Amino acid sequence: MNNTAWWIIIFILILLILAAGEIYRETHTFRVRKYKVKTKKNIGIQNCVKVIFLSDLHNCVYGNKNDKLYKAIQAEMPDMILIGGDMLVAKEGSSVQEALEFVKKLPHICQVYYTNGNHEQRMKENTDIYGDTYERYKAKLENCGVCFLENKAENIEKNGMKFSIYGLELDSSVNRKFKKADVTEKTVEEKIGKKGKDYSILMAHNPAYMDAYKKWGADLILSGHLHGGLVRCPGIGAVVTPQGFLFP
């Protein structure tokens, strides 16, 4: 083997090591991103309302019992925490304990609203596989003060601001790989009813149906599911989604 071939092999090995390091970093660290959302609607704002949005932890733990993440949320002093689903992993033999122990602490900070992702929904619907694991998980969190929004809405008045939070749970078929379901404004309305007059925050786990959410009339849409893309490239961003769609 000549020197050129050896250098090519070394270069490929370095790339693989760097890629492995980046994957480890992305799955073992988190970053707090801040957004300021403004509206032209007259909704009686006297002060701002600070919201923490969490989604798709998939049993991931940052520090001892998720201490690092909990303290980071606590330091932000939010008015409420919204959870967009997939905090656990629906897989035979997988425990919900990590998600349960973390989420049950959050009401000590502020009110928590939880909308299911495809993993919670899979666990809820497939009782032949998971038994009553989901119902027990939900009941324990509700006992700690977590409010589940499963195709439900909650009317909120906070800091002089009136708004509604909707939790949308579409049929499991919307999450099939390599195929988009036919989700329309009417589909959303059938699940959660017509949008009210107040400013509306819609939590809908899968963003693939964003057009339907917009046409329904949501003022602010919060989704997860994409994980920033299963495959990402520098300068391009997400290339492949968990459902197998390109360039989300």
Where are these regions (language model features)?
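N-terminal membrane-anchoring alpha-helices
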Residues: 1-45
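Conserved beta-sheet core of the metallophosphoesterase superfamily
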Residues: 143, 201, 206-248
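Beta-strand-turn-beta hairpins that frame and shape the catalytic cleft
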Residues: 38-52, 146, 153-165, 195-197
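Active-site metal-binding loops of divalent metal-dependent hydrolases
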Residues: 54-59, 85-87, 118-120, 152-153, ...
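Binuclear metal-dependent hydrolase catalytic cores centered on His/Asp/Glu-rich metal-binding motifs
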Residues: 124-145, 158-200, 210-211, 216
